[in-house]
C-alpha cells in the first residue's frame, strides 16, 4: 500500500484556511475585497464577539446567478484570472479563488446573492465544508456572506484566537485599510451592534484619513503627488508637527492594495530625516501606482507583501516625493503682504505664499564661531580676508544697513524676515513679535544648528565642503573605540571635509576641518563622529548615516544655550532661516520655534 496519497478536498481546504484565514479580520479582508472586485459602491460589515461568532459582509455589487454561486465555492474557481499572462499583470484584489472555500471549510457559512434580475437570488449554505441547502431567495442586487462559529470544527485553531476585544480591533483595522484604499465606496462597520465606522462614499481621502488617523493628525495633513519615471506617488502625509510612536499609522498602498513593505516605509522615514525626534514615526496615507507587470502580488498568502521589478525606483519615488512635499510645505505662515490702498486682507485670512529667498539671502547662512582654535592647542587657522567677517565672539556676514544706498542687497522675504526682534530670554531664546502681535520664541541653538546643517548638507551633496587648513596640524587624542572607528572611516571623514591622519596610538593629526566648524572642540567632535562611524557598515549604509554625521557637526558648531547673542547676530539668523528648508525643526527633530498669539496671551492674563 503506498505511503503517499492525495488528501481529500475538505482537508485541503482546511489546510488552505490555515494560510488564508489567520483570524476573523482575514475573513473580513477577503470578503470585502471580493465585494470591491464586484463593483460595490456600499459595503456593510457586522461582527459579533470580534468575528468569532459572526462575520457578515453585505454589498451592492454585481452579484451572481445560481451556477456562479456554486462555482465560487469550488477551490481555485475565479472570474478574475484565465491564463498565465493574466497572472503577470493582476489588477483585481483577489485572483486565486481559494479564500471562499477555505472560509467555508472552517465555519458555518451562508451565501445570499443576486445579479439583480427580477429580484431572484440564490442561497447556499455550507457547514464545515459540507454543502447543505441550495435554494432560491428574494433579494436585491448584490451579495451577503455570513460566517458563523469560526473554527468550530478545528478547536486547535480556535484556542489560539485572542480575546474578542482584540479580534474586534484587528477587524476594525482591516476595514480602515480597505476604506482608505477606496474613498469612492461607502463603508460601515458594526461590532456587537455598535457603529464603529461610518464612511460615506465620495467624501474624499482627507476625510477617510481623518477617521483613520484621528482629529489631531487631520490638522497636519499635507497633499503629496509626483511622478518619477513609471512610478506615481500620491496621497496625504502628516507634517513633522504630528508624529507617532510606531510606524503603524503610515498606510502604504500599491496599485490600490494595502501592503507591508519595509523598504517603502524606510523611504518615507528617510524623507523625514532631521524633522522628527528620535523614536518617532511619520503618519499618512500614500499610494504607489506603477504598471501592473512591474509588481508581483502573488508572493504572500494574504497578499500583504509584494515584489517590485525595480525596487530602487519605487524607493526613490517615495523618498523624493515626500521630501519634496515637506520642503515646500508652509510649516510656518508666510510673511503677510501689505494690501494695496483701499483693499483688505485676503479672504478667509489665509496667508499669501512667498517664495524662499535665493542665493543672496543664503550667504547669511555661514554664521559660525570666530575662527580661532582652542587655547593651548598650538594650532593656527588661516584667517578669512579682512572685512569679510564681523569681529567678536560669533562671526557672520554683515547685511548692509537700510540706508546703504541703491546698491544695498534686498532683505530676504519670508516669515522670519517679517519678525521684529525684541530681545534674548535666559540667554537661550530669541523673542520676536510677528505682525498681529503674536509672540514668537526661537531656540537659538536649534535654529542655528538647522541653518548650519542645511549649508553642510548642500555642500556635501555638491562634494565641495569648504575646508579651513591649519598652518600647524592639531593633534587630538580620542578614546580607543572612537579612534579605531575613525581610522577605519578616514575616507568618510574626508568626504565630510576633514583632513586627518593617524599620529600614533589613539592620536590623530588634523590638518584641516570644514570652515563652518572653525573654533569647535575637535576632540569632542571627532569622538562623537567616531562613535557614530562605529555603528555604520561600510557600503550604501554609510550614505544614510551621513545625515547623522552632518547633524553632529552642525550641533557642535552652533551657538549654545546660555550664550549671549547680539541683536545683529539675531537679525542675521532670522534672515538666514527664510532661505532654508525644514526651518521649523532642528536636524534632530526638535522644534525651532514656538508661537503664542496675542489672543492666547490676553486670555492667560485675563484680558479676554
Curated annotation (Swiss-Prot):
Its keywords, alphabetically, are: DNA damage, DNA repair
Q: Which domain of life is it from?
A: Bacteria
**What CDD domains does the record point to?**
HATPase_MutL-MLH-PMS-like, MutL_Trans
Return one GO MF term: mismatched DNA binding
SMART domains in the record:
DNA_mis_repair, MutL_C
**Per the UniProt entry, what is one GO biological process?**
mismatch repair
Q: Which cysteines are joined by disulfide bonds?
A: none
- Pfam families xref list: DNA_mis_repair, HATPase_c_3, MutL_C
The job of this chain, per UniProt, is described as: This protein is involved in the repair of mismatches in DNA. It is required for dam-dependent methyl-directed DNA mismatch repair. May act as a 'molecular matchmaker', a protein that promotes the formation of a stable complex between two or more DNA-binding proteins in an ATP-dependent manner without itself being part of a final effector complex.
Which family is this sequence assigned to?
A: Belongs to the DNA mismatch repair MutL/HexB family.
Q: What is the name of the protein in this document?
A: DNA mismatch repair protein MutL
Question: Can you name the source organism?
Answer: Anaeromyxobacter dehalogenans (strain 2CP-C)
Q: What is the lineage of its organism?
A: Bacteria, Pseudomonadati, Myxococcota, Myxococcia, Myxococcales
Amino acid at each position: 500500500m503506498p505511503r503517499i496519497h492525495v488528501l481529500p478536498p475538505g482537508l485541503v481546504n482546511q489546510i488552505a484556511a490555515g494560510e488564508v484565514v489567520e483570524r476573523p479580520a482575514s475573513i473580513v479582508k477577503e470578503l470585502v475585497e471580493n465585494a470591491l472586485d464586484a463593483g460595490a459602491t456600499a459595503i456593510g460589515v457586522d461582527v459579533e464577539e470580534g468575528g468569532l461568532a459572526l462575520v457578515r459582509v453585505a454589498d451592492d455589487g454585481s452579484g451572481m446567478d445560481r451556477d456562479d454561486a456554486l462555482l465560487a465555492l469550488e477551490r481555485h474557481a475565479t472570474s478574475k484570472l484565465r491564463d498565465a499572462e493574466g497572472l503577470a499583470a493582476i489588477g483585481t484584489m483577489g485572483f486565486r479563488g481559494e479564500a471562499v472555500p477555505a472560509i467555508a471549510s472552517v465555519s458555518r457559512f451562508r451565501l445570499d446573492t443576486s445579479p439583480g434580475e427580477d429580484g431572484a437570488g440564490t442561497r447556499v449554505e455550507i457547514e464545515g465544508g459540507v454543502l447543505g441547502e441550495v435554494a432560491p431567495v428574494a433579494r436585491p442586487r448584490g451579495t451577503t456572506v455570513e460566517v458563523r462559529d469560526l473554527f468550530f470544527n478545528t478547536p486547535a485553531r480556535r484556542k489560539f484566537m485572542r480575546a474578542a476585544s482584540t479580534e474586534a480591533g484587528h477587524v476594525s483595522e482591516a476595514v480602515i485599510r480597505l476604506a482608505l484604499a477606496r474613498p469612492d465606496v461607502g463603508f460601515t462597520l458594526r461590532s456587537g451592534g455598535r457603529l464603529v465606522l461610518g464612511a460615506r462614499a465620495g467624501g474624499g481621502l482627507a476625510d477617510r484619513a481623518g477617521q483613520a488617523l484621528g482629529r489631531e493628525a487631520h490638522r497636519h495633513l499635507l497633499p503629496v503627488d509626483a511622478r518619477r519615471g513609471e512610478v506615481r506617488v500620491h496621497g496625504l502625509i502628516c507634517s513633522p508637527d504630528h508624529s507617532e510612536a510606531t510606524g503603524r499609522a503610515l498606510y502604504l498602498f500599491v496599485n490600490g492594495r494595502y501592503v507591508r513593505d519595509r523598504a517603502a516605509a524606510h523611504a518615507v522615514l528617510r524623507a523625514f530625516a532631521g524633522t522628527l525626534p528620535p523614536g518617532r514615526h511619520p503618519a499618512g496615507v500614500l499610494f504607489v501606482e506603477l504598471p501592473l507587470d512591474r509588481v508581483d502580488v502573488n508572493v504572500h498568502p494574504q497578499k500583504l507583501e509584494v515584489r517590485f521589478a525595480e525596487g530602487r525606483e519605487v524607493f526613490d519615488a517615495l523618498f523624493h516625493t515626500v521630501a519634496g512635499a515637506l520642503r515646500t510645505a508652509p510649516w510656518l505662515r508666510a510673511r503677510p503682504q501689505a494690501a494695496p490702498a483701499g483693499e483688505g486682507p485676503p479672504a478667509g485670512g489665509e496667508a499669501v505664499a512667498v517664495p524662499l529667498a535665493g542665493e543672496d539671502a543664503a550667504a547669511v547662512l555661514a554664521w559660525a564661531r570666530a575662527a580661532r582654535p582652542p587655547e593651548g592647542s598650538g594650532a593656527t587657522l588661516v584667517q578669512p580676508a579682512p572685512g569679510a567677517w564681523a569681529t567678536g565672539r560669533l562671526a557672520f556676514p554683515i547685511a548692509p544697513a537700510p540706508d546703504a544706498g541703491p546698491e544695498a542687497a534686498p532683505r530676504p522675504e519670508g516669515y522670519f524676515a517679517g519678525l521684529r526682534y525684541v530681545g534674548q530670554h535666559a540667554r537661550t531664546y530669541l523673542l520676536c513679535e510677528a505682525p498681529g502681535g503674536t509672540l514668537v520664541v526661537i531656540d537659538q541653538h536649534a535654529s542655528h544648528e538647522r541653518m548650519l546643517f542645511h549649508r553642510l548638507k548642500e555642500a556635501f551633496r555638491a562634494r565641495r565642503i569648504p575646508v579651513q587648513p591649519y598652518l600647524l596640524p592639531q593633534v587630538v587624542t580620542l578614546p580607543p573605540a572612537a579612534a579605531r572607528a575613525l581610522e577605519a572611516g578616514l575616507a568618510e571623514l574626508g568626504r565630510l571635509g576633514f583632513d586627518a591622519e593617524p599620529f600614533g596610538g589613539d592620536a590623530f593629526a588634523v590638518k584641516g576641518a570644514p570652515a563652518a566648524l572653525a573654533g569647535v572642540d575637535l576632540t569632542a567632535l571627532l569622538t562623537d563622529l567616531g562613535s557614530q562611524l562605529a555603528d555604520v557598515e561600510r557600503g550604501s549604509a554609510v550614505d544614510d548615516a551621513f545625515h547623522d554625521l552632518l547633524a553632529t557637526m552642525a550641533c557642535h558648531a552652533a551657538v549654545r544655550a546660555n550664550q549671549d547673542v547680539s541683536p545683529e547676530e539675531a537679525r542675521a539668523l532670522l534672515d538666514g532661516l527664510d532661505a532654508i528648508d525644514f526651518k521649523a525643526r532642528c536636524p534632530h527633530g526638535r522644534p525651532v520655534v514656538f508661537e503664542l498669539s496675542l489672543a492666547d496671551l490676553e486670555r492667560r492674563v485675563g484680558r479676554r
